[in-house]
Amino acid sequence: MNIRLMFTLIALLVLTVSFSGANSCFKRNRQCKGSFLKSACCEGLKCVNGRCT
């Protein structure tokens, strides 16, 4: 029973992380912080002066 519960919790955690990761990029003109967060802006956009361009 405990093993099954643990497996369910791990599965939920993995789903949550993968789902939030898919929607974590910022679209054009969204605020962003610094160039070290390369994944902050969506693909093809860069963080310039605090905005994704």
UniProtKB/Swiss-Prot annotation:
GO terms for molecular function: toxin activity. Keywords: Disulfide bond, Knottin, Neurotoxin, Secreted, Signal, Toxin. The presence of a 'disulfide through disulfide knot' structurally defines this protein as a knottin. Expressed by the venom gland. It comes from the Eukaryota. This is U1-poneritoxin-Dq5a. The keyword DNA-binding does not apply. Coiled coil: none annotated. Transmembrane segments: none annotated. The lineage of its organism: Eukaryota, Metazoa, Ecdysozoa, Arthropoda, Hexapoda. Its main location: secreted. May have neurotoxic activity. It is found in: Secreted. One of its GO terms (cellular component) is extracellular region.
